[in-house]
């Protein structure tokens, strides 16, 4: 599992990617959001869901058509996310502290 700064991430970010960043109430000190595909028939195609803490499982935002990478209906544009994160996703985020993991796997810490 490898984390990359969003500011240095290549152009496409596919569903299943996880974003980790420092946060505060209503989240914990660090929160993770996963890029998830919406079910068929939904108005939008993808969005972000909280995967950690007491807000885990809650939907954060559906992403607009302009968020997608050109010609890639199930991948987001990293540059769109960088340009729109504070307006569309989480206003209180330092963009230089957002990490992205595209090969997220279960924790190896379970006994």
Pin down the residues of each PLM region.
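Short beta-strand-centered aromatic/proline hotspots
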Residues: 27-41
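Glycine-centered tight beta-turn/hairpin loop motif at sheet-sheet or coil-to-beta transitions
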Residues: 24-28, 54-56
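Intrinsically disordered, low-complexity, charged/polar segments
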Residues: 52-111
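Short, solvent-exposed secondary-structure boundary/capping segments
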Residues: 42-51
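Tryptophan-anchored aromatic micro-motifs
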Residues: 15-24
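Mixed-charge, Lys/Arg-rich low-complexity intrinsically disordered regions
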Residues: 1-14
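Short beta-strand element of the conserved SAM-dependent methyltransferase core
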Residues: 19, 35, 47-48, 58-60
